[in-house]
Each structure stands twice: as C-alpha cells, then as structure tokens.
Design a protein with these regions (language model features):
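Extracellular-facing binding/remodeling surfaces
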Residues: 115, 124-130, 286, 315-316
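Detector for the c-type heme attachment site
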Residues: 120-127, 151-152, 188-192, 235, ...
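Flexible coil segments in periplasmic/lumen-exposed cytochrome c-class electron-transfer proteins
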Residues: 22-116, 155-276, 311-352
Length: 352
C-alpha cells in the first residue's frame, strides 16, 4: 500500500510539473525559446562591458559543416549554401528588391569588433524571427532609445539565459552614433508586414528549441496540450532555420478563447487589471509617429516584453502601470489578440 501511495504521489508530482510548465506559472520560459524554466543560478554566457559581442556574449556552438549545396528560395534567382546564408558579417540577401540599400552596419556589421550584421538576426527587411525582434516600421527615435537602453542596462532579459539580449547590449555599446542612426533610420523606413498567423487550439505541435531559441516541430511527434502557453514556430521550418527566408513568417498556437479574452483587456483595460493598449498604441494598435505599433508582430516577442517590463528588467515608466497586475495568462490573452490584428502601415503601399 505504501509503495502504491508513493507511486500515486510521484505521478501527481510529475503531472503537476507538466501543468506548471504548460501554465507558465514559473514565468513564460517558452516565450524566451526554452523548454523549461531556468535552474537556480543558470544564466547565459558572461558578457562584461569590455566583451566582444560575438563570440564572447553568445553560446558556444560547434560550427556547422557546409555541405556546399547551393539552395534557393521561391521568387529569387539567388542561391547560397547554408553557411553563406548565415555568414555573420554579410549574410544572404535573398530579395534586395524588398528593401532600400542597406547601410554597411546593417549589411555587414563590423567584424574586427565582433559586431555582427543587423541583417543576420533581423533580416534585411527588418521582419526578424521569434527569438529576436522585428524592427521594420518602428519609429526611428524609438529604435534609438532601445539601443540606448540596451547600452545603459535599462533593457535586459528577465530570463537570464537569453544570450542574444546580452549580445544586443554589447553591440549597442560598440556602435558609433552614426551607425546607430543609420540602422534606426533604415529599419524605420520600411513598413511592417503581418508576420504571424494566430491559431486558437487546445493543443500544439511538440517542438524542440535551437541554441538561439527558435522553436521547430519535432518530426513524427504527437501534439501536446497547449495549457496557458503560446507556441510559435516557422510556417516553413526548413526555409527559416536552414536559409533564413525573409518572406516566410510564423504561426502561433494560442489557447482556445484567448483572442476574445485578450480583446477585452486590450480595449477596456479589464476593469482596472491593465490600461487600455489602444490609449497609446492607437485604436488599430498600429502605433503612431512616436509610439511603436504592436499589431501582427511576433507573439513570443510581445510576451517577453510584457514580462520583462513587469519584472523590471526592461525599464519603462509608460508601461509600468499597464503590466503591474498582469498574470502570465493575461499576457497570453493580450498577445493572442494583439498578434492576430491586421497590420496597416502608412509606409506599405502594396495593392490590397
């Protein structure tokens, strides 16, 4: 009987651990690209002020052997090997017609100082991926302020393992004023284009995380309960992970009912639980000349920022009251609604 009781207790503990992981009650580690919460004392690589952004502030990984195969993507005549596509100081530009001429700091970075090209992570078109930030269409002054906050330590990650946040801080310290201005003006000049498809579901594909925090589906694995999480992954995993496809976006699986719950919080404030997002970000959440748009952007990124602001690792006076009372479930709901909204950019002149 005692053995049976111990087995029942252990099974209950295991089930509780799964529920805790899926509820995000230890913090939304899934939004940071991790499969479980950080262990006590666990952190990313040391990144002191004098460090070179790369490789000192990045996780050490075994270089991928280049198979020499030239690959291509739909709608372009260009071809690159995987390592050419990922070259830190001149990554592949698949669609140069999609953006203005890139400043040198965006296209190539500064190799002597370990400053990788902005286009490596954020793409030449500024759309970025779930593990970093989409920067296209943000106000130039806002981008400049974020670089200043990274530099001063006012913007850090609430998950201490997130190495690319530390690398951004190191890059910000290395940038000249002219480089920071050029990068900000460049990304601000391009429209943000809707990048994520939001799907309400009670389950999500099982995923694995890359060293940089990109979620990829586990081939052949059954779906798993979504709990109170958002699981975001590339629409075309191989194109994104292998070739950095800047035209292929993401799909975000969110809990059933979360979009409607999020709409109530975003548009009314939820009876004092938060502040109406539309007050500052605009009725359509597409921002203003000075305030960033949040509609249709990466779900993982939005959750990270809400949680970072609440935990005080991203310091911002304007958002302090808005995030103070939010639970992780609230953040999931808000994000589900915000990420699902249409994008209307005054810079986007494409026919509709």
């Amino acid at each position: 009987m005692r053995a049976l009781l111990r087995a029942v207790i252990c099974a209950g503990c295991a089930a509780g651990a799964v529920v805790a992981a899926q509820s995000g009650q230890d913090g939304p580690h899934w939004a940071y690209g991790y499969m479980k919460p950080p262990a006590p004392g666990e952190s990313g690589p040391p990144c002191p002020p004098a460090a070179r952004p790369f490789p000192d502030c990045a996780y050490p990984v075994t270089p991928t052997a280049d198979d020499g195969i030239k690959r291509t993507l739909p709608g372009t005549t260009r071809s690159f090997t995987r390592n050419e596509a990922y070259f830190d100081y001149g990554p592949a530009d698949w669609y140069p017609e999609d953006h203005p001429a890139m400043p040198d700091i965006v296209a190539r970075g500064r190799q002597a100082d370990g400053v990788r090209a902005c286009a490596l992570c954020h793409y030449p078109n500024g759309q970025g991926k779930m593990e970093n930030g989409g920067v296209a269409g943000l106000p130039a002054a806002y981008i400049q302020q974020q670089l200043a906050d990274f530099k001063s330590g006012a913007r850090r990650s609430a998950d201490p393992r997130k190495a690319n946040t530390n690398e951004m801080a190191a890059i910000a310290r290395k940038l000249t004023d002219a480089e920071a201005t050029a990068a900000a003006d460049y990304f601000a000049s391009m429209p943000w284009r809707k990048w994520v498809r939001v799907v309400e579901s009670d389950s999500a594909p099982r995923v694995r995380a890359t060293s940089n925090g990109l979620f990829l589906p586990v081939a052949g694995a059954p779906a798993e309960p979504i709990g109170q999480r958002i699981i975001e992954m590339p629409e075309r995993p191989e194109s994104t992970e292998m070739m950095r496809d800047p035209r292929s976006g993401f799909v975000a699986y969110v809990p059933i009912g979360s979009i409607a719950k999020g709409e109530a919080l975003v548009t009314t404030g939820g009876d004092g639980r938060t502040v109406r997002c539309t007050t500052c970000h605009g009725a359509d959440l597409n921002g203003t000349a000075t305030i960033p748009g949040i509609a249709g952007r990466s779900a993982s990124y939005i959750v990270r920022q809400l949680y970072d602001m609440q935990q005080g690792t991203r310091q911002t006076k304007t958002m302090k009251a808005a995030v103070a009372k939010l639970t992780v479930e609230d953040m999931v709901n808000i994000t589900a609604y915000v990420a699902s909204r249409p994008v209307e950019s005054p810079l986007d002149t494409r026919p509709r």
